[in-house]
UniProtKB/Swiss-Prot annotation:
One of its GO terms (molecular function) is structural constituent of ribosome. This is Small ribosomal subunit protein uS4. It comes from the Bacteria. Belongs to the universal ribosomal protein uS4 family. CDD domains: S4 (cd00165). GO terms for cellular component: small ribosomal subunit. GO terms for biological process: ribosomal small subunit biogenesis; translation. Part of the 30S ribosomal subunit. Contacts protein S5. The interaction surface between S4 and S5 is involved in control of translational fidelity. PROSITE patterns: RIBOSOMAL_S4, S4. It comes from Lawsonia intracellularis (strain PHE/MN1-00).
Length: 208
């Protein structure tokens, strides 16, 4: 699987917005985007006029990077979203939100989606009582995500819960912090996604 090895803060500066890729650091004055809110490189401060295609492409890249999804899988999500009932763009965001790694992050059981993927691959969580190691699994209403007791002392899990209040737990999820257990109460709705995303641009890009 392809992997981005450059500084993650450069991605935020490239997209012109915080992508919250580094967990707790993004909420501090150490955030590189807060200190240098312009694109990286020698000509980063120069604003270039963008074509409609470039605007659509940047929006797609931004969303891909937020959720940590490669192009092939992102396009597959779009195909499924386009075939499903409802609005294609909203369906696409729902598929991304229902990824297990995103749910673990949203519950506050990991500092970032990157960390959530690492923890899942190491078998730290259970899904409906069964050990799971696939970050891209889609959760459904009624599913429960839990940290078994033997894994609750892992520092990154315990530390993550201390900052969940800063970003909040979405209404479609419920967390019992005392038992490290989260439940999917409902499917995510468009209004549950507070991050600035214009999904219509992505639909236009893939519809060409």
């Amino acid at each position: 699987m392809a992997k981005y090895n450059d500084a993650k803060c450069r991605l935020c500066r490239r997209e012109g917005t915080k992508l919250f890729l580094k967990g707790d650091r993004c909420f501090t004055d150490k955030c590189a985007y807060d200190r240098r809110p312009y694109a990286p490189g020698q000509h980063g401060r120069v604003r270039k006029k963008m074509s409609d295609y470039a605007i659509q492409l940047r929006e797609k890249q931004k969303v891909r990077r937020v959720y940590g999804v490669l192009e092939k899988q992102f396009r597959e999500y779009f195909v499924h979203a386009d075939m499903a009932k409802g609005i294609t763009g909203v369906n696409l965001l729902s598929y991304l939100e229902r990824r297990l790694d995103n749910v673990v992050y949203r519950l506050g059981l990991a500092n970032s989606r990157v960390q959530a993927r690492q923890l899942i691959r190491h078998g730290i969580f259970t899904l409906n009582g069964h050990k799971v190691t696939i970050p891209s699994l889609q959760v459904n209403v009624g599913d429960s995500i839990e940290v078994p007791e033997k894994n609750r002392k892992i520092s990154v899990v315990a530390d993550a819960q201390s900052i969940v209040g800063r970003r909040g737990c979405p209404s479609w999820l419920e967390l019992d912090a005392s038992t490290f257990k989260g439940v999917v109460k409902a499917l995510p709705q468009r209004e549950d996604i507070q991050f600035p995303i214009n999904e219509h641009l992505i639909v236009e890009l893939y519809s060409k």
